Amino acid sequence: MSTTGQIIRCKAAVAWEAGKPLVIEEVEVAPPQKHEVRIKILFTSLCHTDVYFWEAKGQTPLFPRIFGHEAGGIVESVGEGVTDLQPGDHVLPIFTGECGECRHCHSEESNMCDLLRINTERGGMIHDGESRFSINGKPIYHFLGTSTFSEYTVVHSGQVAKINPDAPLDKVCIVSCGLSTGLGATLNVAKPKKGQSVAIFGLGAVGLGAAEGARIAGASRIIGVDFNSKRFDQAKEFGVTECVNPKDHDKPIQQVIAEMTDGGVDRSVECTGSVQAMIQAFECVHDGWGVAVLVGVPSKDDAFKTHPMNFLNERTLKGTFFGNYKPKTDIPGVVEKYMNKELELEKFITHTVPFSEINKAFDYMLKGESIRCIITMGA
């Protein structure tokens, strides 16, 4: 029986309040409206961003809410005006979008869509501001326009990347956020040449994605920098050739790296959000050609300073959002990198849990035990 145009009742993991375990509830998911797509989610994974907003320590809490933004699924139905997607398509919902009409979308240099740029405070859909989720008639808020901790979700079509139907969704679902953020920061923004050296600041999931990018690019040395030495053995699996813990040195880490590399690395990628690490990442690149890329998100009031001579000596500092990938245009190509065995995804997946045990995924991340935990829907 077709569910097109009908309300679908399904299970979702609802966050009723900040920091409390998610509760599996039966929710009603309304049909997609104009420029929207309803997706059956098959696999989702937990990102640190989900945990950050679930804890709600640094922002206005918005509850009850359905979190989740790294996922893979199949289109169930499409709303009015959707022409590039149809039922049965294999897709990745993305936390940011590509309307295809704004100046950013028309620019080859930008992926910062005016309409669908990431918005953490919006609890409804762009079309009408309303939620497509409800329990007993009461709305449940969306998260990042994706809300993938639900067996069915409704997403703006501009936030949906159509991918190769042969790609295993339980693997490629992790491409839709953190991994691509790090990978693209290296491949698309830092752009190391084969044989060059790259320093990665922060060896969490995003930093390991950046290291994977350096490995794919053919970097000869990939130097990982982290305060947690327990991460070093794992980092070697991602192509990191040597690791440095700033706590082990009595001089600034940028000086340590400069001494290790005859004047500085060719490229650096900062993945922590620490202002101190941003300064270090910039000042550790070689003069004349060095490029540093900032990925980590700082606190709201943060600022940093560095001597202008660092720029005049031809060091370059760049920032990036989502690895400079346009969601609909570029993410299918990242999936193809996996399909042709250029990109290795399995090593990022450390745990798998059934949907009924989704809170275990939060435990693994809070304890620092996981890179990515796959949550199998319908299990």
From Swiss-Prot:
Cellular component GO terms, alphabetical: cytosol; plasma membrane
In-chain residues carrying the UniProt-annotated modification N-acetylserine: S2
Inactivation phenotype: Loss of alcohol dehydrogenase activity. Increased resistance to allyl alcohol. Decreased survival, associated with impaired lateral roots development, upon oxygen deprivation leading to hypoxic conditions. Impaired root acclimation to hypoxic stress.
Induction: Transactivated by MYB2 in response to various stresses. By 2,4-dichlorophenoxyacetic acid (synthetic auxin) in Arabidopsis as well as in maize. Induced mostly in roots and shoot apex by hypoxia during water submergence or oxygen deprivation, in a MYB2-dependent manner, and partly via an ethylene-mediated pathway. Accumulates in response to hydrogen peroxide H(2)O(2) during the early stages of hypoxia signaling. Decreased levels upon combined hypoxia and diphenylene iodonium chloride (DPI, an NADPH oxidase inhibitor) treatments.
Cofactor note: Binds 2 Zn(2+) ions per subunit.
Record's comment on post-translational modification: Glutathionylated.
Binding site for an alcohol: T49, H69
Catalyzed reaction equations: a primary alcohol + NAD(+) = an aldehyde + NADH + H(+); a secondary alcohol + NAD(+) = a ketone + NADH + H(+); ethanol + NAD(+) = acetaldehyde + NADH + H(+)
UniProt binding sites for Zn(2+) 1: C47, D50, H69, E70, C177
Tissues with expression: Root specific. Also detected in etiolated seedlings and leaves in cold conditions.
Binding sites annotated in the UniProt record for Zn(2+) 2: C99, C102, C105, C113
GO biological process per UniProt: cellular response to hypoxia; positive regulation of cellular response to hypoxia; response to abscisic acid; response to caffeine; response to cold; response to estradiol; response to flooding; response to hydrogen peroxide
Cofactor dependence: Zn(2+)
In-chain residues carrying the UniProt-annotated modification Phosphoserine: S229
Domain of life: Eukaryota
Miscellaneous information on this protein: Unlike most plants, Arabidopsis contains only one gene for ADH.
Role of this protein: Alcohol dehydrogenase catalyzing the reduction of toxic aldehydes to the corresponding alcohols. Mostly active on ethanol (EtOH), but exhibits broad substrate selectivity for primary and secondary alcohols (e.g. cinnamyl alcohol, octanol, geraniol, butanol, propyl alcohol, pentanol, isopentanol, ethylene glycol, isopropanol, methanol and tertiary butyl alcohol). Also catalyzes the reverse reaction to convert allyl alcohol to highly toxic acryl-aldehyde. Required for survival and acclimation in hypoxic conditions, especially in roots.
Family per similarity comment: Belongs to the zinc-containing alcohol dehydrogenase family. Class-P subfamily.
Protein name (database record): Alcohol dehydrogenase class-P
